[in-house]
Amino acid sequence: MAGSDTAPFLSQADDPDDGPAPGHPGLPGPMGNPKSGELEVPDCEGLQRITGLSRGHSTLIVVVLCYINLLNYMDRFTVAGVLTDIEQFFNIGDGSTGLIQTVFISSYMVLAPVFGYLGDRYNRKYLMCGGIAFWSLVTLGSSFIPREHFWLLLLTRGLVGVGEASYSTIAPTLIADLFVADQRSRMLSIFYFAIPVGSGLGYIAGSKVKDLAGDWHWALRVTPGLGVLAVLLLFLVVQEPPRGAVERHSGSPPLSPTSWWADLKALARNPSFVLSSLGFTAVAFVTGSLALWAPAFLLRSRVVLGETPPCLPGDSCSSSDSLIFGLITCLTGVLGVGLGVEISRRLRRFNPRADPLVCAAGLLGSSPFLFLSLACARGSIVATYIFIFIGETLLSMNWAIVADILLYVVIPTRRSTAEAFQIVLSHLLGDAGSPYLIGLISDRLRRSWPPSFLSEFRALQFSLMLCAFVGALGGAAFLGTAMFIENDRRRAQLHVQGLLHETEPSDDQIVVPQRGRSTRVPVSSVLI
């Protein structure tokens, strides 16, 4: 009798709602796969059967999503590439200039939960098509604003957030429903390569198109045409895969979405999600500040060093720093994302907490190099570029890993909502306010000193040093994530397999058949 009670009970629930059928593959940890803490990974043929898409088609979908991700970030940082020209055209200071990015991010942040809710319940392909089409039209319209209507530029940049919100909350969940395990990590790394590459191309396209056309307005007219192509590719190539099927190893029965309020409560009780989102907020704070202000800081540094003339009203400002910083952003992004994913993948074989630990190492390592890049700017622009290169490489190690953490600690029917609220948190406390905050501190410091090009440089230099401190705080948040990551991942796996039932917030239970009856026991007794 003892033997019957201690048999592999987790696959023998007699209530169909209590768990999977006997022989169900891929139970997590020692309960279903004693050699691994991972779900059993379907092969290519299994993935094709489950999703209804060939591997080639699934890969092509990821390529289309990467193209759109690249385009989104290219558009965002095209503005940064011509920032000095915008300041001169509208006759605004650093504080008002910082509002351009802040208004965009704030709109994006407000709309993200809306698209997160819709993305967990409705066709994701059509949501993205509508959002990107609207974004393309608004971006084109923003290039025709006269100099006396700066407020209208702020309004249009805010409306651009519709496209970003419709895409960024949904696209990673499509990848999660097409691939699992290491395949998913690789595809996410490809997807997130588009962030630094797109950002760098934004700087380059903004500065070069302005030089060729002789007018910065033309820099804002490049991405709308590419956006039309993106909508066509989405409509023709992307197909909607069933949510969570690749993790259940079956196209049915589908996971049922819960209420939005239940989703929020579950996410708030997920420490790995909360802490990794706080860590990612630090990444957003630093990257948002550098994205907008680094080219302007480098230009001011070279003016102080006597390497370039100052940018005066009516002059065409030098674009070489935007070009160089754009190239650095591209290279460091590709290198950092690739290094982060590969290091994490190798360490994961020996340490299941590798993902948050690699993220922590990246942030804690980047902070001193970013500080050195600012401290050396008065003496050597070459040293500044070298330290920026190292710091941004370490910072970029986080992008794909943070996305992977979210996807494996959150169940499929909550992932778009989780993406949305990670976006809200990271932008609310990160890059929504950081460009404006840096500009505001710079303005306050500059007013306390006699007017000069040196005071402009020093004010921005001291204000940007805040980024190094925030980066260190983010590293601490990822160290906290490492304490909870194993249990939270296993809970998500149990839920996907149908073994974990959320009844009350403090009483998550799994079904354990004993002597022909279903008995509920606290999940804490299993998650050791």
Swiss-Prot record:
BP GO terms, sorted: lysophospholipid transport; phospholipid efflux; regulation of lysosomal lumen pH
Q: Where is this region: Disordered?
A: 1-38
- For this UniProt entry, which segments traverse the membrane? 60-80, 98-118, 126-146, 160-180, 187-207, 218-238, 278-298, 323-343, 357-377, 381-401, 421-441, 465-485
Q: Which GO terms describe its cellular component?
A: lysosomal membrane; lysosome; membrane
- Kindly state which keywords UniProt assigns to this record, in alphabetical order: Acetylation, Lipid transport, Lysosome, Membrane, Phosphoprotein, Transmembrane, Transmembrane helix, Transport
Asked whether the keyword Transmembrane is assigned, the reply is yes
Q: Does the keyword Membrane apply?
A: yes
Query: Which SUPFAM superfamilies does the entry mention?
Result: MFS general substrate transporter
- Where in the cell is the protein located? Lysosome membrane
The Gene Ontology terms for molecular function here are: transmembrane transporter activity
Q: How does it assemble?
A: Interacts with BCL2 and BCL2L1.
Into which family does the record put it?
Belongs to the major facilitator superfamily. Spinster (TC 2.A.1.49) family.
**Matching PANTHER family:** PROTEIN SPINSTER HOMOLOG 1, SPINSTER
Protein name, per record: Protein spinster homolog 1
* Species annotation: Rattus norvegicus (Rat)
Q: What are the top taxonomic ranks of the organism? A: Eukaryota, Metazoa, Chordata, Craniata, Vertebrata
